[in-house]
Amino acid sequence: DMIELGMPFSDPMADGPAIQAASLRAIKSGMTLKGSLELATQFREKYPDIPLILMGYYNPIYRYGVELFLKDAQAAGADGLIIVDLPPEEDVELCDPSQKSQMNFIRLITPTTLGDRLPFVLEKASGFIYYVSIAGITGTKSAQMESISNAVNRIQQVSDLPVVTGFGIRTAEQAALIASLGDGAIVGSAVVEIIAESDAQNLSAEETSRKVSDFTKSLADAISAHKHE
């Protein structure tokens, strides 16, 4: 299992309503990029062996300073980055410095990444490949299994990296089916919605954590059971 920690940004253009709202709530509460790195440090101290991926947008990193960000991200124990608004044409900005710092730079592939562009996008990818199962914003639709299977196969012909599928996965059953087509499933919006609902109900941090843990355990159990069928 891996944990993806979102770094809040005021204009999260690739995210759906749930994560957009969460990002704005975090900013309103005073969360910053530095604060996100402090959370990463706390996580790493408690869970030394679980891979931790930082996901976000380039603007806050640019303002923070790329060199300082990579230094602090490494010190915090991050294993990789998913920066959704930096295409390979902009590798000099963050991808190249990340790789020099031994930080995985994870690429996103969408259903519209076709032809010669696929190997170009994946040329400097590391860690794993994040396949976006639908075109558009996160957490709003679910793609047909056949189209996902075909896309994963197409990616695997170009790269030996694990292919993990995300966007629109909301149930344990969906997670198990999608994970069986590749190397894993990413669930974000559904988790964020549980946190938002708990917040609206004024539940304690412990109660919220338990609800999230129960949900993510159901995902992991379903994926594991499906693999052993």
Where are these regions (language model features)?
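Glycine-enriched alpha-helix->loop->beta-strand junction motifs that scaffold or abut catalytic
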Residues: 73-79, 99-106, 123-129, 181-185
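Active-site-adjacent beta->alpha loops and helix N-cap segments on the catalytic face
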Residues: 10-21, 31-41, 62-68, 83-100, ...
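Alpha-helix-loop-beta-strand connector modules within alpha/beta enzyme cores
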Residues: 17-53, 96-110, 146-163, 210-228
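Histidine/lysine/aspartate-rich catalytic loop segments that bind and position anionic ligands
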Residues: 102-139
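Conserved, mostly hydrophobic/aromatic
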Residues: 3-6, 73, 121, 178, ...
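Short, electropositive alpha-helical surface patch
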Residues: 58-76, 181-189
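Catalytic cores of alpha/beta
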Residues: 113-122, 165, 169-185
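Glycine-rich phosphate-binding active-site loops on the catalytic face of alpha/beta enzymes
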Residues: 1-12, 80-82, 131-139, 168, ...
